[in-house]
């Protein structure tokens, strides 16, 4: 409609409570187009509860879950089996659960990772979430065999029943795109671990460039272990992961720099070229710092 000589007043209202645009969305599809993979205010900060360690791999079948369980056994033996602090072990491999099967000999689990995601999607307060779920998680005790005997830890399975797995209400990805919840998952896991008196939280993530894994991978407060075999495709894929995970990350002792576990190393195999290639993947996008930090960034694990 043409009204000659008339003008329309336009006013803008700014909500001071709105989430800042500088808060990066921790998903691969977003990080790809950013200079940094991380929300700068979180770099070099700690989680509010106990440390969270995430085990990830580009490919399946390279020993990621076995590496996590080896960590559990080593922790148990160093901490006097039943007398030490328990670990909270979470099966976050939503598309191919593995650790969940440790709980399948028992009755239906009282609680699951998918339950945790649903409650976190619905509630805004991390303290309220923890109060709702802590008692149920404490019921999830599982005995794990070690060389020195049985150790008891808390294992949070992916799901309670198959239908829950096939028809998900919430996922790590849906949390990452929710208002003010981009980095809530790591905070909930950390505070949950503290509430149930766990020493650490260990998370077995979905393999690949999966948005189900991205929210924890791109939270700079989470310690990451990337597991790769010596195969060509596994090493190349791990290099892609490292390039994305190192974007904007200072290479210094205050950063939780992703570490690599090189598995299935045959006796007598020369891995120097593989290790050099993996270390080189950190540098194009990272903020360079102390190069000595990178000396032990790759750990070789023999084939057994």
Language model region names:
Residues 1-44, 247-304:
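C-terminal lobe/tail of nucleotide-utilizing enzymes
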Residues 24, 29-32, 63-67, 177-185, ...:
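Phosphate/oxyanion-binding active-site loops and adjacent basic polyanion-contact surfaces
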Residues 38-97, 101:
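Walker A/P-loop phosphate-binding motif and the immediately C-terminal alpha-helix
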Residues 70-72, 102-113, 117, 171-173, ...:
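Short secondary-structure boundary/capping segments
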Residues 85-86, 182-291:
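Conserved catalytic-core segment of NTP-binding enzymes
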Residues 94-194:
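P-loop/Walker-type NTP enzyme "switch/lid" segment
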Residues 155-161, 229, 301-304:
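Short loop/turn segments at strand-loop or loop-helix junctions that form parts
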């Amino acid at each position: 409609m043409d009204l000659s000589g008339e003008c329309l007043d336009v006013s803008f209202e700014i909500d001071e409570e709105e989430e800042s645009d500088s808060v990066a969305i921790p998903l691969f599809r977003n990080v790809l187009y950013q200079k940094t993979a991380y929300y700068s205010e979180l770099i070099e900060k700690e989680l509010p509860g106990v440390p969270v360690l995430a085990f990830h791999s580009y490919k399946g079948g390279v020993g990621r879950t076995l590496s996590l369980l080896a960590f559990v056994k080593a922790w148990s033996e160093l901490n006097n089996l039943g007398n030490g602090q328990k670990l909270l072990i979470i099966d976050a491999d939503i598309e191919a659960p593995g650790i969940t099967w440790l709980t399948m000999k028992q009755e239906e689990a009282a609680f699951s990772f998918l339950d945790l995601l649903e409650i976190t999607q619905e509630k805004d307060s991390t303290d309220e979430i923890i109060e709702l779920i802590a008692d149920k998680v404490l019921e999830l005790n599982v005995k794990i065999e070690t060389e020195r005997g049985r150790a008891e830890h808390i294992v949070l399975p992916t799901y309670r029943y198959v239908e829950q797995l096939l028809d998900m209400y919430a996922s790590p990805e849906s949390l990452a795109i929710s208002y003010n919840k981009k980095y809530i998952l790591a905070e909930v896991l950390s505070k949950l671990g503290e509430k149930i008196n766990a020493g650490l939280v260990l998370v077995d993530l979905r393999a690949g460039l999966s948005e189900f894994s991205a929210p924890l991978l791109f939270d700079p407060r989470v310690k990451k272990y990337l597991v790769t075999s010596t195969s060509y495709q596994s090493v190349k894929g791990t290099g892609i992961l490292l390039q994305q995970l190192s974007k904007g990350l200072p290479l210094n002792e205050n950063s939780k720099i992703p570490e690599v576990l090189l598995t299935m190393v045959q006796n007598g195999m020369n891995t120097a070229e593989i290790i050099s290639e993996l270390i080189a993947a950190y540098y194009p996008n990272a903020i360079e710092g102390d190069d000595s930090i990178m000396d032990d960034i790759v750990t070789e694990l023999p084939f057994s």
